[in-house]
Amino acid sequence: MSREKDSIASSDEHNSRGIELADRGWLDEALKEFKKAIDLDPNSSHAHDNLATVFAEKKQFRDALDAYLVSLRLEPDSATAHYNLACFLSAHALDFAISEYQTAIELEPDYPDAHLNLGLTYADAGKPEDAVKELKTAIELEPSDPFPRHELAGLQMDEGDYRSAITQLKDVTRLEPDNFEAWLDLGICYAQKGFYAEAERAYEKAKALKSDDLLLVYNLAALYAQWGRKADALEHLKLALKVDRVKVSSWLKADPMFEALEGEAEFEALR
């Protein structure tokens, strides 16, 4: 029994030393101490937890997850263990996913879904350039799949690259003629580039699929306002306001596409 107590005491000493080293930023040395602590006391939940924290700092996410789960298995009723695992997942989930997708691609470079999902994850992580690169690779590997093209177009729209988005969306609508969102996005891109007739044609395709969509009706109003077709703009704006006045009114406050109608009595009455 005394030998077991000695092992636990020695384990705690190594654990404490590991914490001090980790606080100083000496992560490799801290890892060694936590591993010694675990060798002396494999049931030390806090040693596994501390080991996981250092693995996460070193971006060894799989090792970190394993250590957190061991800690949780040792103390399933520990609120701290659950909390620390949740913190790890919330802080590192995207980086962890990126790392795993990259590993999948290293093992199988021509894996279109891995490139697609890596691109989407890069986008979620705020890395648009990396996202565009991976989505383009997914398109090259699976040119008949409209989904990565639409996702790439969405990124390009967010970046203000409407011309490139138009190219992708034309392919999406060719591959998937009943894709309402693609026709709507294509209309938005054409309108942003000043191609009003093309925008109207795209919106009409969308309208044939879902005529009462609020965003479609609103964008038609915006198109006609820019185009100088005031009567059509007001007609569609009234329809949009009838569907959801609060939402449409909030859109109008920050939408420069209706500047041509400002000062018009009928328009001002609608705002």
Tell me what each language-model feature is:
Residues 23-36, 57-70, 89-103, 124-137, ...:
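Structural signature of tandem alpha-helical TPR/SEL1-like repeats
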Residues 1-13:
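TPR-adjacent "capping" and linker segments in tetratricopeptide-repeat scaffold/adaptor proteins
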Residues 160, 164-167, 174-271:
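Alpha-helical protein-protein interaction modules
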Residues 12-23, 46-57, 80-90, 113-124, ...:
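Conserved alpha-helical positions within TPR/SEL1-like repeat arrays
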